[in-house]
UniProtKB/Swiss-Prot annotation:
Organism: Zea mays (Maize)
Membrane topology classification: Multi-pass membrane protein
InterPro entries the UniProt entry points to: NADH_UbQ_OxRdtase_su1/FPO (IPR001694), NADH_UbQ_OxRdtase_su1_CS (IPR018086)
Keyword tRNA-binding recorded: no
HAMAP family noted in UniProt: NDH1_NuoH
UniProt keyword terms in alphabetical order: Chloroplast, Membrane, NAD, NADP, Plastid, Plastoquinone, Quinone, Thylakoid, Translocase, Transmembrane, Transmembrane helix
Main location: plastid
Catalytic activity annotation: a plastoquinone + NADH + (n+1) H(+)(in) = a plastoquinol + NAD(+) + n H(+)(out); a plastoquinone + NADPH + (n+1) H(+)(in) = a plastoquinol + NADP(+) + n H(+)(out)
Protein name per UniProt: NAD(P)H-quinone oxidoreductase subunit 1, chloroplastic
Any one GO molecular function term: oxidoreductase activity, acting on NAD(P)H, quinone or similar compound as acceptor
Gene name in the database record: ndhA
Protein family per UniProt: Belongs to the complex I subunit 1 family.
EC numbers on record: 7.1.1.-
Length: 362
């Protein structure tokens, strides 16, 4: 009986251990689901904001029938795309045609892994965080090129080639700007870069130490988002809809989602690299510095950090939306000349100057 009791207790302990493993596995997945839910809500808010801002710029009435103030218009559009027929080109490369949008969306979603939204609120604090973002974001144009090539349409293929050329042209200045920030912060981690700007509050932002790099990063990130005046890959007057021409239904909705996800990622990285991230702007003041032992206050501090990060990101969103609805589209030669003959030398010179100052200060 004693042996039987020991065996039963052992079995119960193993069953409890397995239960704990299952619970831990579910808890590990919860932050990912929370992040995906937050991203979905943010995209819906950005779509609504763009429609309201564009309506204000053009002096017209924006969406107002779908829900209060038109808040449900984006949900209605998404539902419509989900219910539409998924038409496949008869002579296209169907596997590549189906994979292209997924590659573009996944590459953008993976970028959120290294973005610190608030204090101690980041999925992966990696030592090469900013380089991982650059490497991952360079995968998205491959999906666009696959989509254009597999459509068996000259307009789609030309749009895919334009997307690849535009990404290559502006990825290099973007990388040089990130390298300059990493030299100032002595780290490639996004969390370390934010904490390096926290010493002097508003005056410690990299915006003041890297004004030229900030402007180059701003222009390059807008070009990476492929929005006006840099929307050459999908110019309606020239290419119908570019690489999206043959797409319909949910696949077309994925490309629509990529545009706003890319804009959100760029806004958050501008905030993290140049605007101090989650740090409050007033120097030498921490409202919760005396209450670090209280877990509730710690959670409140994290929530306020997320709010500050998103507020700064929405400033960049407002600028990008305003630029889209006020400036005309550039020609392809102007776009390439801006990237290779103007932004690239300036970003390289900025990196060399930053390196020189860092060596002198040692």
């Amino acid at each position: 009986m004693i042996i039987d009791r020991v065996e039963v207790e052992t079995i119960n302990s193993f069953s409890k251990l397995e239960l704990f493993k299952e619970i831990y596995g579910l808890i590990w997945i919860l932050p990912i689901f929370a992040l995906l839910l937050g991203i979905t809500i943010e995209v819906l808010v950005i779509v609504w904001l763009e429609r309201e801002i564009s309506a204000s710029i053009q002096q017209r009435i924006g969406p107002e029938y779908a829900g209060p103030l038109g808040l449900l218009q984006a949900i209605a559009d998404g539902t419509k795309l989900l219910l539409k027929e998924d038409i496949l080109p008869s002579r296209g490369d169907i596997p590549l045609f189906s994979i292209g949008p997924s590659i573009a969306v996944i590459s953008i979603l993976l970028s959120f892994l290294v973005i610190p939204l608030g204090y101690r609120f980041v999925l992966a604090d990696l030592s090469i965080g900013v380089f991982l973002w650059i490497a991952i974001s360079s995968i998205a144009p491959i999906g666009l090129l696959m989509a254009g090539y597999s459509s068996n349409n000259k307009y789609s293929f030309l749009g895919g080639l334009r997307a690849a050329a535009q990404s290559i042209s502006y990825e290099i200045p973007l990388t040089f700007c990130v390298l300059a920030i990493s030299l100032l912060s002595n780290s490639l981690s996004t969390v370390d870069i934010v904490e390096a700007q926290s010493k002097y509050g508003f005056f410690g932002w990299n915006l003041w130490r890297q004004p030229i790099g900030f402007l180059v990063f701003l222009i390059s990130s807008l070009a990476e988002c492929e929005r006006l005046p840099f929307d050459l890959p999908e110019a309606e007057e020239e290419l119908v809809a570019g690489y999206q021409t043959e797409y319909s239904g949910i696949k077309y909705g994925l490309f629509y989602l990529v545009s706003y996800l890319n804009l959100l990622v760029s806004s958050l990285f501008v905030t993290v690299l140049y605007l101090g991230g989650w740090n409050f702007s007033i120097p030498y003041i921490s409202f919760f510095g005396f209450f670090q032992m209280n877990k509730i206050i710690g959670i409140l501090e994290m929530v306020i950090g997320i709010f500050i990060t998103l507020t700064k990101a929405y400033l960049f969103l407002f600028i990008s939306i305003t630029i889209r609805w006020t400036l005309p589209r550039m020609r392809m030669d102007q776009l390439l000349n801006l990237g290779w003959k103007f932004l690239l030398p300036i970003s390289l010179g900025n990196l060399l100057l930053t390196t020189s100052f860092q060596l002198v200060s040692l």
